[in-house]
């Protein structure tokens, strides 16, 4: 992974030019992240068209090379971002997608690894925790160099909801959603705070904020994707911006703490699974995992979420008989 240490030229290969992928590329252009973006998709005309369209925005932002790419172009990339996969339909859970997207994923990871790619995989296709684990198994890469978007979007939704409730800037809210990016995710209320004031203290000072309001707020966060899909067919702006933030942390060697899908090696009593938790990320991938002290209820929620993921993961690999590199 020699090129990622060269701050003057950072190369990203995006696999998947659907709504999420193209929105991600646009976010990268607007924020001036990376100097080269290659876009891979089975629909070549779409990647060519998007490359031209995005390049037209460069005079308003910063110089960048954007082009329709092949898997072989990943050989000297710093980062491969995978958004390709079957989209989530109305009424369909993220876990329902697993069998369809496992097969798609294998057709992506194999040629990327064969190209000589030696950077970092960032996975966003759903179900993200399972597909990130699958990317690790299929690639044979070290676990720190395969990461998923995890609960980054859920956490952003959570912070925004709290911010709207108390009328502050969402960037001043510090709170996390952990676990599966999906139905078994949970809020870490015990460490949530607004500018250092805990949620418990805030509620005590504002009796109009009842517990049932907080419960409803989290449920709306958890189910936000279903509502958006019902209204407009897909979610993409939020996750695309989250992916751009993660990419920036990797490429700029930030050592940023972000809620990501990472490999558990004893943390929270979990092993051999990818799941959402705050972690430190830099140009080498995951530097370390922050094991937040959880309440008994939160710990129970983490175990429940992991158990659900483990079951689906085991069933999916058994059913699809996928050959892996580790």
Curated annotation (Swiss-Prot):
Allosterically activated by fructose 1,6-bisphosphate (FBP) alone under acidic conditions, while it requires additional activation factors such as divalent cations (Mn(2+)) under neutral conditions. Under acidic conditions, Mn(2+) is an inhibitor in the absence of fructose 1,6-bisphosphate (FBP). In case of L.casei, L-LDH binds four fructose 1,6-bisphosphate (FBP) molecules per tetramer, while usual allosteric L-LDH binds only two fructose 1,6-bisphosphate (FBP) molecules per tetramer. Substrate binds at residues 88, 94, 126-129, 154-157, 235. Keywords: Allosteric enzyme, Cytoplasm, NAD, Oxidoreductase, Phosphoprotein. The modification Phosphotyrosine is found at residue 226. GO terms for molecular function: L-lactate dehydrogenase activity. This is L-lactate dehydrogenase. Its EC number is 1.1.1.27. It comes from Lacticaseibacillus casei. One of its GO terms (biological process) is lactate metabolic process.
